[in-house]
Amino acid sequence: MAESNQVVQAYNGDPFVGHLSTPISDSAFTRTFIGNLPAYRKGLSPILRGLEVGMAHGYFLIGPWTLLGPLRDSEYQYIGGLIGALALILVATAALSSYGLVTFQGEQGSGDTLQTADGWSQFAAGFFVGGMGGAFVAYFLLENLSVVDGIFRGLFN
């Protein structure tokens, strides 16, 4: 009979943790990748974490609203995408603020500043500013796509 090696094992040998150690989830590459995300990167203040997360979200939220939104077949599709993305960022900021207020009521600061009400408030503020900025950058690029395309093609030397 062939001997089989278990690829999926309990995390740190403890089956009661509720996490499985797989070649993907427990690899050095995955740990490095997740460790470099703004939520886990060391040395970032909560407002900078929120700013970075917000910029990414604001930038990529324009696309679905532009291509799939109610104004997709009109000349106002880009402004419709901008308004939809800004509204969604506003709702997400309200949800982040509510989460921070409810979760960290009356708790004093711990080692991680993101685990306090004040830190979470800073994260939400950074998310709002970054999200709005990212959405406006994406709108500017979409609205001036012919100019940006010309720059990359070398027409403006």
Curated annotation (Swiss-Prot):
Transmembrane regions listed in the UniProt entry: 82-102, 127-147
Annotated keywords: Membrane, Photosynthesis, Photosystem I, Thylakoid, Transmembrane, Transmembrane helix
GO biological process: photosynthesis
Alphabetical list of Pfam families matching this protein: PsaL
Gene3D superfamilies according to UniProt: Photosystem I PsaL, reaction centre subunit XI (1.20.1240.10)
InterPro entries, per the entry: PSI_PsaL, PSI_PsaL_sf, PSI_suXI
Entry membrane topology: Multi-pass membrane protein
Cell compartment(s), UniProt: Cellular thylakoid membrane
Top-level taxon of the source organism: Bacteria
Cellular compartments per GO CC: photosystem I; photosystem I reaction center; plasma membrane; plasma membrane-derived thylakoid membrane
UniProt main location, coarse: membrane
Family: Belongs to the PsaL family.
NCBIfam families tied to this protein: PRK00704.1-3 (NF001926)
HAMAP family: PSI_PsaL (MF_00447)
Protein name: Photosystem I reaction center subunit XI
Organism for this UniProt entry: Synechocystis sp. (strain ATCC 27184 / PCC 6803 / Kazusa)
Native organism taxonomy: Bacteria, Bacillati, Cyanobacteriota, Cyanophyceae, Synechococcales
